[in-house]
């Protein structure tokens, strides 16, 4: 169970469930096909059934580092990938080592993928969008984030509130447009995809057990999020 600061909400979050086939596996031609394939549920949050101005119910909100915890609310956005609504962190506290995080209420899982559509809009200290996985609490999780001020994508682990960088890719991260950030992970291996192209390949064993997925920002970043997807890996 994820831990952190909860915000009360009276309306259940707009959780759209989509069932997809289990992760396909390449097999040798002579290997028999199993008679049954277990389906794996992918949980997608579109945020479209909630009235703007409310936090999505069921999410757990926390903050790594200092400064204010943050304020996550649903907002309307005409250009949303799945209109009309998105999720945004709207507290513009400029504390540099401040990382607001919103952990989704999906069941914890160990292997699979977490992805989100994100639009970095503004921020003077930072302009970041991130996804977390194997999230234990606000001080312990894996993170990949893109930064439109630095033009890079990075991979970290956060342990006991300390953020440690493991990998970096330098390339264009454009403000004001929608992007896709996805992390596929299995055992100690993680692959980070930015706008559909793999940019980071990393191994680490800091967190090996199950945890939740979610989204993340830094400092005064004003970033929009949509179509947050948690997809456990099938057997």
For the regions a protein language model found, what residue spans apply to each?
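Short, solvent-exposed beta-strand-to-loop segments that form ligand-recognition rims
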Residues: 193-212
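Bacterial Sec-dependent signal peptides at the C-terminal "C-region" and cleavage site
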Residues: 17-38
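Secretory/extracellular carbohydrate-interaction modules
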Residues: 89-154
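Short, aromatic/His-centered strand-loop micro-motif at the edge of beta-sheets
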Residues: 160-180
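Short tryptophan-centered beta-strand motifs in secreted/extracellular beta-sheet-rich domains
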Residues: 47, 114-116, 178-186, 190-192
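Ligand-recognition surfaces built from glycine- and aromatic
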Residues: 34-36, 207-235
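Extracellular carbohydrate-recognition regions
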Residues: 31-64, 226
